[in-house]
């Protein structure tokens, strides 16, 4: 019970700060380059997972410089799950170029909730059941709160303070080289995902 109260106090203390940066606490891993893939959603999810692992202290053998989960392997398994150990997902294979598929962080949360674990290393086809780096236990969803943006921001700060990072998606409708309002017609899609590590 003491650990819970201590964590609650720390979460409140951090979320009440005028500014916070998880890098100052050593819980943010180096930025990974998604290259020319559409996998920002996988990269942002893995970055948040890495920060959560470091924040929680569940693995004393890793640091921000040594912890490196594979976002491409996570994206690969979203589209090419194959069979789970119980045979419940036999035939779950999509013949798509997973590197170019859009997605959202919720896809990773759903995948990991089915015990498809994150993996380390560079091999995207690594079996996540036989070679898990960690196991997913929970995810927190913060619904958008347009009627009370201050409370929405407070919820995000509390989640960062408690877990280390959050992911989000946005639809950038301003006109730039890569984002252009002529091409973004107020769709329900959010074409980019990022990780927030502070404020």
PLM segments and residue spans:
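Catalytic-core signature of thiol
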Residues: 1-199
């Amino acid at each position: 019970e003491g650990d819970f109260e201590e964590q609650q106090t720390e979460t409140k203390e951090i979320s009440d700060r005028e500014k916070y940066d998880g890098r100052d606490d050593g819980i943010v891993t180096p930025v990974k380059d998604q290259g020319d893939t559409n996998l920002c959603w996988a990269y942002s999810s893995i970055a948040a997972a890495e920060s959560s692992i470091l924040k929680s202290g569940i693995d004393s053998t890793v640091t921000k410089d040594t912890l490196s989960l594979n976002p491409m392997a996570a994206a690969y398994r979203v589209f090419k799950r194959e069979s789970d150990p119980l045979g419940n997902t036999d035939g779950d294979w999509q013949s798509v170029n997973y590197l170019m598929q859009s997605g959202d962080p919720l896809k990773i949360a759903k995948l990991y909730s089915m015990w498809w674990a994150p993996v380390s290393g560079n091999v995207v086809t690594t079996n996540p059941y036989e070679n898990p780096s960690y196991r997913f236990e929970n995810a927190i969803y913060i619904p958008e709160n347009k009627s009370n943006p201050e409370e929405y921001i407070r919820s995000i700060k509390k989640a960062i303070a408690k877990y280390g990072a959050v992911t989000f998606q946005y639809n950038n409708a301003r006109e730039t080289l890569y984002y252009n309002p002529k091409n973004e017609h107020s769709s329900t899609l959010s074409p980019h995902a990022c990780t927030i590590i502070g404020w």
